[in-house]
Amino acid sequence: MEYFPFQGSGTDTEELNNIIATGAQAIINNLTLLEREITKFKTSQKREWMIKGELYYEGEHDILTHERKVIGVGGRLVKAENLPNNRILDNQYAKLVDQKVNYQLGKPLTLETENDTYLKLLQKIFNKRFHRTLRNMGLDALNGGIAWLYPYYNEQGEFTFKRFPNSEILPFWKDAEHTILDSAVRMYTESGYEGDKEVLYEKVEVYTSNGVKCYVWFNGRLVEDVEKPPISYLTIEDEDGKEIQLNWQRVPLIPFKFNIKEIPLLKRVKSLQDGINTMLSDFENNMQEDARSTILILHNYDGQNLGEFRRNLAQYGAVKVRSSDGSKGGVESLQIEVNSDNYKAILSLFKKALIENGRGYDAKDERMANNPNQMNIQSMYSDIDLDANGIETEFQASFEELLWFVNMHLANTNQGDYENEEVNVIFNRDILINEMEVVEVLDKSAYLPLETRIAQHPYVSDVQLELKRLKQEQKEQMDQYDNYETTFKEKQGGVDGTTT
């Protein structure tokens, strides 16, 4: 075998990947090293962002734990118990996540392959239940940067799929690009009883190509789970009724990434979302602080140091001053106006910046007024479309891995060998279109194949079904024409041409 000049028998990337793969195998085979990696992962910033992304989507924002503080004596911040402390959140982040997920995965997938039998088998596997799972995978990928799909056989022996929360999975990769999985650890909690007391146990499962090993996480150590011995991914019975343990050639955990860096969406927009919540809360606080709208100045009722001055101003809305001669006493007011327009302007800027940084779209965009043309619509969707292209690239690669398990399942269950069959997975984006313009363009595109035009038609959801209906309609028209021709000939002189 010959190699390119200066390349040798292996590239630097291959050597690096070999080192990474060797290191991953060493960790999995050494419980002490594995315990260290689990401890690091449980407290890592990456996992914290995964958990935080899920919490923010559910509406658990930092503003809900916000404490109102003022400058006290000595310039130190102290908690103010007597001031309004509204904690208002406007969850624009959840809206952005739903927008992106529904845009990318709101519609069912379209599968294309030249083998009709294979297509029917795939459609049976990738059914509506799978579409729901895939959409939830999209939520996981955006909130945590990566999602995990587990293909397995359930208790009824059916081939199906399960999603694992990304904060539960610690992957070990074979390569620096994180494309080939060597093994993985799953950490989760499970309730149980010690006598009459309900307790939570931390469980750990180690997934390799040799099956699954189960442990209990106790005081930072891995203890073998006596209730769950090592298991394989599949158990079958031979002709004699004897159980045979089988495993996949690959680890059955498939990553679906939001982007190549596995960065969650929240990391782009958290400061903007927090800013929106803070502005709304501060505005409500100011509206409720009647005493703060008017500051009382008490003349010649003892002076005060700066720390006491700031505390009294914030908490009581009053300050005491002493004139030089001390002859004048009384009360004077200082009016402060809360300008709501300032809050509106800042909120508008924050929301616009959140949409732009999160690469979404504004459904209230001025370009969508009246009857927008297709160019205006495409312009509004440009940012979310570019981001969707990146997500689709990652998901397409994941589907290649998923199809390997599907093909192995079909082969093992004697449904056919489709390993070399080409499959095109199409993500049907839920985009607003000017239907009239699209239909007009398709009508004028006579040079395109009929199937292509039908696939692009806005009213078509199942291309094969529409083609079947069209063929049936054409057949009925031909039958009507044949019946008409026969009747016409009979009236003219008989079917055989003789005069009647």
Language-model-detected regions and their locations in the chain:
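Extended, helix-rich architectural segments
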Residues: M1-F164, E168-F172, A176-T179, F488, ...
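Glycine- and charge-rich intrinsically disordered segments
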Residues: M1-P5, L272-Q288, I295, E476-T500
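Conserved aromatic-histidine-acidic binding/catalytic patches
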Residues: E48, E58, E81, N85, ...
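Short amphipathic alpha-helical segments
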Residues: E114-Y118, L122-L134, A141, R268, ...
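A short, surface-exposed helix-loop junction/capping segment
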Residues: Y118-L122, G330-E332, Y381
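Extended, regular secondary-structure scaffolds
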Residues: R135-K261
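Extended, charged amphipathic alpha-helical segments
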Residues: S232-P372, N376
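C-terminal helix-loop subdomains that flank or include functional centers
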Residues: E308-D325, V338, N342-A345, L349-T500
